[in-house]
Design a protein with these regions (language model features):
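Redox cofactor-anchoring modules in respiratory/redox and cofactor-processing assemblies
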Residues: 1-198
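Acidic, Ser/Thr/Pro/Gly-enriched interdomain connector segments
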Residues: 198-204
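Short cysteine-rich clusters marking metal-coordination/redox-active sites
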Residues: 206, 212
Length: 212
Protein backbone atom coordinates (compact mmCIF):
# COMPACT_ATOMS: atom_id res chain seq x y z
CA UNK A 1 0.00 0.00 0.00
CA UNK A 2 1.28 3.41 -0.92
CA UNK A 3 2.24 5.58 2.01
CA UNK A 4 1.80 9.33 1.70
CA UNK A 5 1.96 10.34 5.36
CA UNK A 6 5.41 11.28 6.68
CA UNK A 7 7.00 11.66 10.08
CA UNK A 8 6.05 9.89 13.30
CA UNK A 9 2.90 9.38 15.35
CA UNK A 10 2.35 8.97 19.09
CA UNK A 11 -0.11 6.27 20.17
CA UNK A 12 -1.52 5.35 23.55
CA UNK A 13 -1.20 1.56 23.49
CA UNK A 14 -3.63 -0.16 25.85
CA UNK A 15 -5.87 -3.17 26.34
CA UNK A 16 -5.03 -6.88 26.38
CA UNK A 17 -1.36 -6.40 25.61
CA UNK A 18 1.81 -7.01 27.59
CA UNK A 19 3.43 -3.59 27.17
CA UNK A 20 1.07 -0.65 27.57
CA UNK A 21 1.94 3.05 27.43
CA UNK A 22 2.77 5.87 25.05
CA UNK A 23 4.77 4.93 21.96
CA UNK A 24 6.09 6.94 19.03
CA UNK A 25 6.46 5.11 15.73
CA UNK A 26 7.33 6.15 12.17
CA UNK A 27 4.45 6.38 9.73
CA UNK A 28 4.27 3.14 7.79
CA UNK A 29 4.92 0.89 10.78
CA UNK A 30 2.42 -1.98 10.63
CA UNK A 31 -0.16 -2.79 13.27
CA UNK A 32 1.51 -6.20 13.66
CA UNK A 33 4.85 -4.57 14.51
CA UNK A 34 3.22 -2.31 17.08
CA UNK A 35 1.23 -5.08 18.76
CA UNK A 36 3.77 -7.91 18.74
CA UNK A 37 7.19 -6.24 18.66
CA UNK A 38 6.59 -3.07 20.67
CA UNK A 39 3.56 -4.23 22.63
CA UNK A 40 5.00 -7.65 23.39
CA UNK A 41 1.98 -9.59 22.16
CA UNK A 42 -1.29 -10.53 23.80
CA UNK A 43 -1.50 -10.96 27.57
CA UNK A 44 -1.55 -14.51 28.86
CA UNK A 45 -0.79 -15.94 25.43
CA UNK A 46 -4.40 -15.53 24.40
CA UNK A 47 -5.56 -15.10 20.82
CA UNK A 48 -5.62 -11.65 19.23
CA UNK A 49 -9.12 -10.62 18.22
CA UNK A 50 -9.22 -6.95 17.29
CA UNK A 51 -7.52 -3.59 17.59
CA UNK A 52 -9.41 -0.33 17.74
CA UNK A 53 -7.54 2.77 16.60
CA UNK A 54 -8.42 6.43 16.76
CA UNK A 55 -10.27 6.78 20.05
CA UNK A 56 -13.99 6.16 20.73
CA UNK A 57 -14.97 6.86 17.12
CA UNK A 58 -12.40 4.54 15.58
CA UNK A 59 -13.12 1.25 13.86
CA UNK A 60 -12.28 -2.23 15.10
CA UNK A 61 -9.80 -4.02 12.84
CA UNK A 62 -9.14 -7.76 12.65
CA UNK A 63 -6.22 -10.12 12.13
CA UNK A 64 -6.46 -9.61 8.38
CA UNK A 65 -5.59 -5.94 8.94
CA UNK A 66 -2.44 -6.54 11.02
CA UNK A 67 -0.09 -5.87 8.12
CA UNK A 68 -1.73 -2.52 7.37
CA UNK A 69 0.88 0.29 7.45
CA UNK A 70 -0.12 2.94 9.96
CA UNK A 71 -0.92 6.21 8.24
CA UNK A 72 -3.98 8.37 7.68
CA UNK A 73 -5.00 6.91 4.32
CA UNK A 74 -4.47 3.23 5.06
CA UNK A 75 -6.32 3.26 8.38
CA UNK A 76 -9.21 5.12 6.76
CA UNK A 77 -9.33 2.59 3.92
CA UNK A 78 -9.39 -0.26 6.45
CA UNK A 79 -12.46 1.21 8.17
CA UNK A 80 -10.81 3.02 11.07
CA UNK A 81 -8.83 6.24 11.49
CA UNK A 82 -5.80 7.83 13.11
CA UNK A 83 -7.96 10.06 15.30
CA UNK A 84 -6.63 10.87 18.76
CA UNK A 85 -3.96 8.18 18.64
CA UNK A 86 -5.66 5.63 20.83
CA UNK A 87 -4.87 1.98 20.12
CA UNK A 88 -6.77 -0.60 22.16
CA UNK A 89 -6.03 -4.29 21.69
CA UNK A 90 -8.70 -6.94 22.33
CA UNK A 91 -8.44 -10.69 22.77
CA UNK A 92 -10.74 -13.71 22.52
CA UNK A 93 -12.49 -12.79 25.78
CA UNK A 94 -13.92 -9.56 24.34
CA UNK A 95 -17.42 -9.43 22.86
CA UNK A 96 -17.40 -7.17 19.82
CA UNK A 97 -21.10 -6.35 20.12
CA UNK A 98 -20.51 -5.21 23.69
CA UNK A 99 -17.43 -3.26 22.57
CA UNK A 100 -19.47 -1.36 19.98
CA UNK A 101 -22.11 -0.61 22.61
CA UNK A 102 -19.47 0.66 25.05
CA UNK A 103 -18.05 3.19 22.59
CA UNK A 104 -21.45 4.31 21.35
CA UNK A 105 -22.60 4.91 24.91
CA UNK A 106 -19.68 7.35 25.26
CA UNK A 107 -20.58 9.12 22.01
CA UNK A 108 -24.21 9.54 23.05
CA UNK A 109 -23.05 11.21 26.26
CA UNK A 110 -20.64 13.50 24.39
CA UNK A 111 -23.07 14.64 21.68
CA UNK A 112 -23.78 18.39 21.82
CA UNK A 113 -27.31 17.71 20.55
CA UNK A 114 -27.28 20.28 17.77
CA UNK A 115 -28.00 17.95 14.85
CA UNK A 116 -30.71 15.31 14.72
CA UNK A 117 -28.61 12.49 13.18
CA UNK A 118 -26.18 12.50 16.10
CA UNK A 119 -28.63 13.47 18.85
CA UNK A 120 -31.39 11.02 17.93
CA UNK A 121 -29.70 8.60 15.53
CA UNK A 122 -27.01 7.49 17.95
CA UNK A 123 -29.57 6.99 20.70
CA UNK A 124 -31.47 4.68 18.35
CA UNK A 125 -28.25 2.79 17.57
CA UNK A 126 -27.57 2.41 21.29
CA UNK A 127 -31.12 1.17 21.92
CA UNK A 128 -30.65 -1.48 19.24
CA UNK A 129 -27.31 -2.60 20.68
CA UNK A 130 -28.81 -2.80 24.17
CA UNK A 131 -31.64 -4.87 22.72
CA UNK A 132 -29.18 -7.25 21.04
CA UNK A 133 -26.92 -7.69 24.09
CA UNK A 134 -29.99 -8.35 26.25
CA UNK A 135 -31.13 -11.19 24.00
CA UNK A 136 -34.07 -9.39 22.39
CA UNK A 137 -32.47 -8.62 19.03
CA UNK A 138 -33.49 -9.84 15.58
CA UNK A 139 -31.69 -10.13 12.25
CA UNK A 140 -33.72 -7.16 11.03
CA UNK A 141 -32.07 -5.09 13.77
CA UNK A 142 -28.69 -5.75 12.14
CA UNK A 143 -29.90 -4.28 8.86
CA UNK A 144 -31.29 -1.28 10.74
CA UNK A 145 -27.95 -0.76 12.52
CA UNK A 146 -26.09 -0.71 9.20
CA UNK A 147 -28.56 1.58 7.43
CA UNK A 148 -28.88 4.04 10.30
CA UNK A 149 -25.12 4.06 10.87
CA UNK A 150 -24.47 5.05 7.26
CA UNK A 151 -27.14 7.77 7.40
CA UNK A 152 -25.54 9.26 10.52
CA UNK A 153 -22.10 9.25 8.86
CA UNK A 154 -23.48 11.04 5.80
CA UNK A 155 -25.69 13.62 7.50
CA UNK A 156 -24.23 14.56 10.91
CA UNK A 157 -22.81 18.08 11.08
CA UNK A 158 -19.46 17.57 12.80
CA UNK A 159 -16.63 15.08 13.02
CA UNK A 160 -17.97 13.49 16.21
CA UNK A 161 -21.29 12.61 14.62
CA UNK A 162 -19.79 11.61 11.28
CA UNK A 163 -17.39 9.13 12.86
CA UNK A 164 -19.55 7.95 15.77
CA UNK A 165 -20.99 4.90 13.93
CA UNK A 166 -17.51 3.55 13.09
CA UNK A 167 -17.35 1.04 15.99
CA UNK A 168 -20.79 -0.28 15.05
CA UNK A 169 -20.24 -0.46 11.29
CA UNK A 170 -16.74 -1.94 11.56
CA UNK A 171 -17.81 -4.67 13.99
CA UNK A 172 -20.84 -5.44 11.83
CA UNK A 173 -18.53 -5.87 8.84
CA UNK A 174 -15.71 -7.73 10.55
CA UNK A 175 -17.54 -9.69 13.26
CA UNK A 176 -20.99 -10.28 11.79
CA UNK A 177 -20.90 -13.88 12.99
CA UNK A 178 -20.91 -12.63 16.59
CA UNK A 179 -23.92 -10.41 15.93
CA UNK A 180 -25.73 -13.37 14.36
CA UNK A 181 -24.97 -15.54 17.39
CA UNK A 182 -26.49 -12.86 19.61
CA UNK A 183 -29.71 -12.53 17.62
CA UNK A 184 -30.18 -16.10 16.33
CA UNK A 185 -28.76 -18.29 19.06
CA UNK A 186 -29.02 -15.82 21.96
CA UNK A 187 -25.45 -16.62 22.93
CA UNK A 188 -22.31 -14.56 23.57
CA UNK A 189 -19.16 -16.57 22.81
CA UNK A 190 -17.05 -14.26 24.97
CA UNK A 191 -19.51 -14.60 27.86
CA UNK A 192 -19.64 -10.83 28.38
CA UNK A 193 -23.36 -10.24 27.79
CA UNK A 194 -24.85 -11.31 31.12
CA UNK A 195 -28.42 -11.50 29.83
CA UNK A 196 -27.32 -14.26 27.44
CA UNK A 197 -25.70 -16.42 30.13
CA UNK A 198 -27.27 -19.23 32.11
CA UNK A 199 -25.93 -20.49 35.42
CA UNK A 200 -26.12 -23.96 36.92
CA UNK A 201 -25.02 -25.27 40.30
CA UNK A 202 -22.70 -28.25 40.39
CA UNK A 203 -23.84 -30.23 43.46
CA UNK A 204 -20.42 -31.84 43.79
CA UNK A 205 -18.71 -28.46 44.13
CA UNK A 206 -21.40 -26.57 46.04
CA UNK A 207 -20.46 -25.68 49.64
CA UNK A 208 -23.80 -24.11 50.52
CA UNK A 209 -22.45 -20.57 50.86
CA UNK A 210 -25.74 -19.05 49.55
CA UNK A 211 -23.84 -16.45 47.47
CA UNK A 212 -25.19 -17.53 44.10
Amino acid sequence: KRQRSKGTKVFALAGKINNVGLIEVPMGTTLREVIYEIGGGIKGGKKFKAVQTGGPSGGCLTEKHLDTPIDFDNLLAAGSMMGSGGMIVMDEDDCMVSVARFYLDFTVEESCGKCTPCRIGNKRLLELLNKITEGRGTEKDLDTLATLGRVIKDTALCGLGQTSPNPVLSTLDNFRDEYLEHVRDKTCRAKQCKSLLTYTINPELCIGCHLC
